[in-house]
Amino acid sequence: MEASRRFPEAEALSPEQAAHYLRYVKEAKEATKNGDLEEAFKLFNLAKDIFPNEKVLSRIQKIQEALEELAEQGDDEFTDVCNSGLLLYRELHNQLFEHQKEGIAFLYSLYRDGRKGGILADDMGLGKTVQIIAFLSGMFDASLVNHVLLIMPTNLINTWVKEFIKWTPGMRVKTFHGPSKDERTRNLNRIQQRNGVIITTYQMLINNWQQLSSFRGQEFVWDYVILDEAHKIKTSSTKSAICARAIPASNRLLLTGTPIQNNLQELWSLFDFACQGSLLGTLKTFKMEYENPITRAREKDATPGEKALGFKISENLMAIIKPYFLRRTKEDVQKKKSSNPEARLNEKNPDVDAICEMPSLSRKNDLIIWIRLVPLQEEIYRKFVSLDHIKELLMETRSPLAELGVLKKLCDHPRLLSARACCLLNLGTFSAQDGNEGEDSPDVDHIDQVTDDTLMEESGKMIFLMDLLKRLRDEGHQTLVFSQSRQILNIIERLLKNRHFKTLRIDGTVTHLLEREKRINLFQQNKDYSVFLLTTQVGGVGLTLTAATRVVIFDPSWNPATDAQAVDRVYRIGQKENVVVYRLITCGTVEEKIYRRQVFKDSLIRQTTGEKKNPFRYFSKQELRELFTIEDLQNSVTQLQLQSLHAAQRKSDIKLDEHIAYLQSLGIAGISDHDLMYTCDLSVKEELDVVEESHYIQQRVQKAQFLVEFESQNKEFLMEQQRTRNEGAWLREPVFPSSTKKKCPKLNKPQPQPSPLLSTHHTQEEDISSKMASVVIDDLPKEGEKQDLSSIKVNVTTLQDGKGTGSADSIATLPKGFGSVEELCTNSSLGMEKSFATKNEAVQKETLQEGPKQEALQEDPLESFNYVLSKSTKADIGPNLDQLKDDEILRHCNPWPIISITNESQNAESNVSIIEIADDLSASHSALQDAQASEAKLEEEPSASSPQYACDFNLFLEDSADNRQNFSSQSLEHVEKENSLCGSAPNSRAGFVHSKTCLSWEFSEKDDEPEEVVVKAKIRSKARRIVSDGEDEDDSFKDTSSINPFNTSLFQFSSVKQFDASTPKNDISPPGRFFSSQIPSSVNKSMNSRRSLASRRSLINMVLDHVEDMEERLDDSSEAKGPEDYPEEGVEESSGEASKYTEEDPSGETLSSENKSSWLMTSKPSALAQETSLGAPEPLSGEQLVGSPQDKAAEATNDYETLVKRGKELKECGKIQEALNCLVKALDIKSADPEVMLLTLSLYKQLNNN
């Protein structure tokens, strides 16, 4: 008898009493797992009445303590964040700063009020990461979200993962990143099947946007898509922006410390993405009605009327974006704290609150060091600007941008020029191999031959920098040195090493994340490293280097935000020392002009984001445009102007005054204070007086607001159509152009935007007429002359027995008065594919004949190209597409696209269908019937799906005046083509066909999946051992921490920030979340009354997740793994790769790893419930796992007790794998026994260690 075997002293019990005792104990354990502590308490007491023993009494005591603690805590476990309505776990809430709580309340207000998205634009270093994590914690706890996609630069992944572990250790967080395609797919499927957060990078998004936007052959809509460093999509025609738009999402959040970096069009791009086109109208209207007046008003020579108009338009823009936009600077936070020091005294626990008080930031002095060029630099600089033959010698291409590049290099160091140019300037020798040397070569041979003294004497900046760094090292400061050029860092590194400096360096060549982390930690912990060399683009984002107290910006950037990002690596929360920044700028050169433009852009940022109502105007339009004029190279006009304005405002102390006196002794031209810019606002009285007198200004503001609102409403009407064309683009096959694109010869910047929005002209009639199509109006150089190029893009997708997928992208010219797009969609169907193909062939011939005539007539000649679906095309275009970079603009130069459906493409489709059908002939009859039923169901609804699958018409009229507009669907196709050609497209035709084939199996399996057992109790550290089955079980459970791939800190409860709530709430929707699929819904309902996702449940969820990961890794590495164990990507990459697996599968079903949501499935013989649901034949004996006890398993398939007993015996004999097989089968029969589950966990752990 079981009871007597467990407890020898229980032999006095009758069989009936023993059975009752075991039943009560079992039911009490299940109640504990389900979080029903009252029921568990009652059942354990009943068991105690039958047979009192120490084990039962200890459990009763633990549950009683937990119930008492819960009664004391009540609903205070959660706290309403700033009375917003979002409840946040109290321990987490108490660790947040006040401004962070306000940020979380803002994020929740977006969701609560039905806004589709927003921008959190807090200054760098104020904790945007923590705000997002805490917000997601509250949303998951309240079951308001299930699936979140988080996109960020590569170097921030480790930071985010660590923050998630630190703040919400129970949240399910996976990464979609790294070299292992199988691991990426498994992590993504785990989040999509259940719930949680998936973290990926912008480059992964570009390569795998199709995979991220789909699941099992269907569109997958994320609850939230969150972009960190969202200024990556500031230009909406880049591949990052296009692919981000293709991800279906209910809500979108953007995080950036620099929402505007160059112009207001970047702000429009961010809001257009975040609000899905429903806020700021079209780019053309925004540029005309908002950007141009605001920009003109910021110039020093603007008229009073222009200043007043810009002021009111700026106010109106701020009012529009205010509900969707939140930005706080460090200065704002500090001022608010100092003005209200008693704000937190009314909290219940002031001791805890004191921990969360915003620390005082140290003082920052941002100095501009104006440096004179040395005679050699000045001579070359003057000759280059004034003499054409010098330009010809030093430049390979004649363009203003290239000229500016050469001038910038001359300001920094003449040796930055090519080896050939240095030879012509008598700066060194020139050899043949130097001619092929790259501009950014890390090892510059012609510099290696130059002495240190010569390198220093040739650059005024280098002379100053060496003296400065020596002084800072002697004073004990650690310094960051930023430059945009790796060659400059090479020179600085060489000079410093020869002077015995200990230096570290991070630039674009340090690609491994672990190596970056190692160098950062070394600098933070070791004071001996006095200088850290970084490139501005790589080292200026996402790093925390608060060990340094001095920052040197060697060369200014065109973008003020770039330099500001670099400074904020040091000046952020956690910095306790005063910070001094040195920006090195040469007098009278192009660098001074760049700095002027920085100041001007900064004024736009401050006014538009609400930091300043009317910032000071420093420069006129003419002063900003004079880039190539030579001014006084010994003194700076800008420095003299700023000194006269701000000299008396500098915040200083004795040490800083002494240091500035030392800097003046180094022969510099002067010092000005960058941090004092815009410290004094201009009076708005002048502007307000003009506004009151001018009825015109009020009308302009009303007109601008009306146009934006009107266009935004029209765009909402188009969103569904655009979504089916753009965000559902993963359903289409790639279309390969037959010829490469050529740049338009007369367009400087043909940069179309991938916007799902209308691009309208100025008249309301055109706005209204464009409701049914995306319209972009092309204004040719002469006003009034328009060239309308209309095209219809037809996508036809057919389901051939649910296997093959035929697609034909046909382009035809839309005749005038042909009717609306909606009518065309209504009249079309899947059966019209042949007629469309015939018409397109005729159109193709006519277009080819008329092409030369039309090109001759065009004032703005644009190239045309053809789309042909053929194998030869794929091979021809491949090398050209690989040259596209992430920031390249994807253009469509006024195309007359033509698509012909060739025999090759049709044959390819039919071959795929034949292969898939042939593979399925060996499947069981019932499985085929299920598949056919689902196919028939899909084919019965052609009218509902035809706009998305069959025919999708889009009318495009190009607008060259609005170069930023784009056709996102075509751009996505270009990204898709590029990815598919280079082998990185995640979903091939075979992959989608396979997913459709297995669709019926996947849905039928959901109800049979075992589920996780978790503790649903609001219990702190005192009651954390409720679910223990005794000391042995506790030990076995604790041992599972060794398989945690994140961090062992999940089980270190001493840290105050490792909270136990904020886990993804496990709902009961399929697929199941618990081990037992038989947990009644009423139990789960009662659990949500006042319970939090407390520590034990959170940690158990994490452990079970890690066990599943381990199991899948074991399955993947098993020599005898079944066909369902290999990842789905084997099908995606090539059909030939899966052949060796399909040979082992008698039923012909290739089951993907995403279907193994149960942690119990290790082999086909053990998946009895799945075989039953599929109706598949019993597996052959040859498919049994190596060494499995076939005789015992065959006899005891449905005998739970026998399987458990056999498993224990095998475990005692040391046969881990065989014991695991038996226990897995037992759990398939009855999965609610915690003793067997914990024993299985222990076996998995032992097997993994072995």
From Swiss-Prot:
<comment type="subunit">
    <text>Interacts with PLK1, which phosphorylates it. Both proteins are mutually dependent on each other for correct subcellular localization. Interacts (via N-terminal TPR repeat) with BEND3 (via BEN domains 1 and 3); the interaction is direct.</text>
</comment>
<keyword id="KW-0995">Kinetochore</keyword>
<comment type="similarity">
    <text>Belongs to the SNF2/RAD54 helicase family.</text>
</comment>
<dbReference type="GO" id="GO:0005524">
    <property type="term" value="F:ATP binding"/>
</dbReference>
<dbReference type="InterPro" id="IPR000330">
    <property type="entry name" value="SNF2_N"/>
</dbReference>
<dbReference type="GO" id="GO:0004386">
    <property type="term" value="F:helicase activity"/>
</dbReference>
<protein>
    <recommendedName>
        <fullName>DNA excision repair protein ERCC-6-like</fullName>
        <ecNumber>3.6.4.12</ecNumber>
    </recommendedName>
</protein>
<feature type="modified residue" description="Phosphoserine">
    <location>
        <position position="969"/>
    </location>
</feature>
<dbReference type="InterPro" id="IPR001650">
    <property type="entry name" value="Helicase_C-like"/>
</dbReference>
<feature type="compositionally biased region" description="Polar residues">
    <location>
        <begin position="1149"/>
        <end position="1173"/>
    </location>
</feature>
<dbReference type="InterPro" id="IPR050496">
    <property type="entry name" value="SNF2_RAD54_helicase_repair"/>
</dbReference>
<feature type="compositionally biased region" description="Basic and acidic residues">
    <location>
        <begin position="1115"/>
        <end position="1124"/>
    </location>
</feature>
<feature type="modified residue" description="Phosphoserine">
    <location>
        <position position="1118"/>
    </location>
</feature>
<dbReference type="GO" id="GO:0051301">
    <property type="term" value="P:cell division"/>
</dbReference>
<feature type="modified residue" description="Phosphoserine">
    <location>
        <position position="995"/>
    </location>
</feature>
<keyword id="KW-0067">ATP-binding</keyword>
<feature type="compositionally biased region" description="Acidic residues">
    <location>
        <begin position="1125"/>
        <end position="1135"/>
    </location>
</feature>
<keyword id="KW-0378">Hydrolase</keyword>
<feature type="compositionally biased region" description="Polar residues">
    <location>
        <begin position="1075"/>
        <end position="1087"/>
    </location>
</feature>
<keyword id="KW-0131">Cell cycle</keyword>
<feature type="modified residue" description="Phosphoserine">
    <location>
        <position position="1181"/>
    </location>
</feature>
<keyword id="KW-0132">Cell division</keyword>
<feature type="modified residue" description="Phosphoserine">
    <location>
        <position position="774"/>
    </location>
</feature>
<dbReference type="GO" id="GO:0006281">
    <property type="term" value="P:DNA repair"/>
</dbReference>
<keyword id="KW-0498">Mitosis</keyword>
<feature type="modified residue" description="Phosphoserine">
    <location>
        <position position="1004"/>
    </location>
</feature>
<dbReference type="InterPro" id="IPR049730">
    <property type="entry name" value="SNF2/RAD54-like_C"/>
</dbReference>
<feature type="modified residue" description="Phosphoserine">
    <location>
        <position position="755"/>
    </location>
</feature>
<keyword id="KW-0137">Centromere</keyword>
<feature type="repeat" description="TPR 2">
    <location>
        <begin position="1200"/>
        <end position="1233"/>
    </location>
</feature>
<feature type="modified residue" description="Phosphoserine">
    <location>
        <position position="1188"/>
    </location>
</feature>
<feature type="short sequence motif" description="DEAH box">
    <location>
        <begin position="228"/>
        <end position="231"/>
    </location>
</feature>
<keyword id="KW-0158">Chromosome</keyword>
<keyword id="KW-0802">TPR repeat</keyword>
<dbReference type="GO" id="GO:0000776">
    <property type="term" value="C:kinetochore"/>
</dbReference>
<dbReference type="Pfam" id="PF00176">
    <property type="entry name" value="SNF2-rel_dom"/>
</dbReference>
<feature type="region of interest" description="Disordered">
    <location>
        <begin position="735"/>
        <end position="768"/>
    </location>
</feature>
<dbReference type="GO" id="GO:0016887">
    <property type="term" value="F:ATP hydrolysis activity"/>
</dbReference>
<comment type="function">
    <text>DNA helicase that acts as a tension sensor that associates with catenated DNA which is stretched under tension until it is resolved during anaphase. Functions as ATP-dependent DNA translocase. Can promote Holliday junction branch migration (in vitro).</text>
</comment>
<keyword id="KW-0677">Repeat</keyword>
<feature type="repeat" description="TPR 1">
    <location>
        <begin position="21"/>
        <end position="54"/>
    </location>
</feature>
<feature type="modified residue" description="Phosphoserine">
    <location>
        <position position="1098"/>
    </location>
</feature>
